[in-house]
Regions:
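Vicinal oxygen chelate
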Residues: 1-30, 49-50, 77-140
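Core segments of cupin and vicinal oxygen chelate
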Residues: 16-20, 26-71, 105, 121-123
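Short linear motifs in intrinsically disordered
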Residues: 43-46, 91-92, 112-115
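Short secondary-structure boundary/capping segments
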Residues: 60-63, 78-81, 114
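A short, sequence-level motif marking secondary-structure junctions
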Residues: 72-77, 139-140
Length: 140
């Protein structure tokens, strides 16, 4: 005879990606306009008033357009506080509200509240060494 065993499987919990790419690189310098001009002249950056924007495609299928912003800030900016570092990285994320809830449960320091603009939602957190990180859920 044949023996049959019923297999029961638990539905797999599919978690949304947290970080999908680098959304921006921000750093302090003495003269942001001069720094931007240097990068334009010597490295060919196509600059805008905020620095430059790099366009790329997210994922292997190359259908979802994404951007990374490169921006120099004045060395006197307070924008990176409470971090004492001269840089801040912006990470593109999916479902920022859900991610922030998860990070709170993981005891990650959330610096501020989620702000929404016409180009996406933003919040700042601190990493394990106190570096301020910007999380961005773009509206693509």
């Amino acid at each position: 005879g044949f023996a049959f065993k019923t297999l029961t499987t638990q539905p797999s919990k599919v978690e949304a990606k947290r970080v999908t790419g680098i959304g921006g690189i921000f750093f302090k310098c003495k003269d942001p306009k001069k720094m931007t001009a240097w990068y334009q002249k010597h490295l060919g950056f196509n600059t805008n008033p905020y620095g430059t924007t790099f366009d790329w495609y997210e994922g292997a299928d190359s259908t979802k357009k994404a951007q990374t912003q490169w921006t120099p800030f004045a060395e006197t900016t307070k924008y990176f506080e409470p971090s004492k570092k001269d840089f801040m990285i912006n990470y593109r994320v999916e479902n920022l509200v859900t991610l922030v809830d998860a990070l709170k449960k993981e005891a990650v320091t959330i610096v501020d509240t989620i702000e929404t603009y016409d180009y996406g939602k933003f919040v700042h957190i601190l990493d394990a060494e106190g570096n301020k990180i910007q999380l961005w859920e773009p509206i693509d």
